[in-house]
C-alpha cells in the first residue's frame, strides 16, 4: 500500500493500512460491506494541508482525521433486495442517499452513532432527516441508532415505530420495497443548484448595474461642477 494521506503507518516498517467507517451486511453465505463516503469534517476527514492535526488527533484520541472513504455510494444485495445503507452523517445528504436508489436500492437503512450528541436537539434533528430521505426517494427506511432514536419509516415519511432516547429496546417491522426511481433520485438537488445559479446571475447583474450607476453619477457630478465654474 502506498503512503498516501489517509494511510497509516504500521509500526516502524514500510507497511501502511487504511481505517474505514463501514457498514456490514452478513448473510448465511456472504459478507458484504461498504465504506462511508461522506466523512464527517474534522472528526473523520481533515484537509491534507492540515496534516499536522492528524498526529495530534490520534494521540489525543479526540478524532480519527484520516479515515479512507469510498469514492461513491455502493449498493449491497440481500436475497431479492438491493440495500442502500447510509452511515451516520451521510443521511444528512439527500442527493447522496438518492444515489443509492438511482443504483437500484429498493430499501434504505441508516446506521448511526448519535451518542455524542448527548441529550440535545441534535439527535432529534438527525432522526428527522430520515423522514426527508424517505419522502425524496419513496423508500421505506429502517434506522438504527446506538443510543436512540431508532425507528421505521414508510415511503411517505411517516414514522411507523420509534424507540426512546437512551432506553434499551428491540422493534420489528415489515417494510415494503420499491424499485421506482423518483425524479429527485435521478436529478438530485436541482432546485438548489438552480437557486445558486440564479443568485449568482442576480448578484453579477446588481454589481454591474451599481458600477454603471456609479460611473454615470460621477460623470454627472463632474459635468455639474464644470458648469458652476
Where are these regions (language model features)?
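Short leucine-rich amphipathic alpha-helices used at interfaces
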Residues: 163, 169, 212-213, 219-220
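Cytoplasmic C-terminal tails of single-pass
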Residues: 217-229
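Soluble catalytic domains of enzymes that build or remodel membrane lipids, polysaccharides, and related
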Residues: 1-191
Amino acid at each position: 500500500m502506498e503512503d498516501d494521506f489517509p494511510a497509516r503507518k504500521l509500526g516502524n516498517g514500510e507497511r501502511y493500512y487504511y481505517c474505514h467507517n463501514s457498514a456490514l451486511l452478513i448473510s448465511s453465505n456472504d459478507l458484504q460491506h461498504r465504506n462511508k463516503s461522506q466523512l464527517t469534517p474534522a472528526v473523520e476527514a481533515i484537509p491534507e494541508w492540515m496534516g499536522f492535526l492528524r498526529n495530534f488527533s490520534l494521540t489525543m484520541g479526540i478524532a480519527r482525521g484520516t479515515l479512507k472513504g469510498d469514492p461513491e455510494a455502493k449498493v449491497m444485495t440481500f436475497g431479492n433486495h438491493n440495500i442502500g445503507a447510509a452511515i451516520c452523517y451521510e443521511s444528512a445528504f439527500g442527493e447522496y442517499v438518492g444515489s443509492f436508489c438511482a443504483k437500484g436500492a429498493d430499501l434504505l437503512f441508516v446506521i448511526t452513532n448519535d451518542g455524542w450528541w448527548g441529550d440535545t436537539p441534535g439527535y432529534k434533528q438527525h432522526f428527522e432527516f430520515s423522514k426527508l430521505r424517505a419522502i425524496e426517494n419513496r423508500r421505506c427506511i429502517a434506522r438504527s441508532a446506538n443510543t436512540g432514536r431508532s425507528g421505521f419509516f414508510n415511503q411517505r415519511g411517516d414514522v411507523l415505530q420509534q424507540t426512546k432516547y437512551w432506553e434499551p429496546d428491540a422493534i420489528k417491522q415489515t417494510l415494503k420495497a420499491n424499485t421506482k426511481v423518483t425524479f429527485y433520485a435521478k436529478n438530485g438537488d436541482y432546485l438548489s443548484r438552480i437557486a445558486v445559479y440564479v443568485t449568482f446571475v442576480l448578484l453579477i447583474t446588481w454589481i454591474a448595474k451599481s458600477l454603471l450607476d456609479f460611473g454615470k453619477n460621477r460623470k454627472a457630478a463632474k459635468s455639474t461642477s464644470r458648469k458652476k465654474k
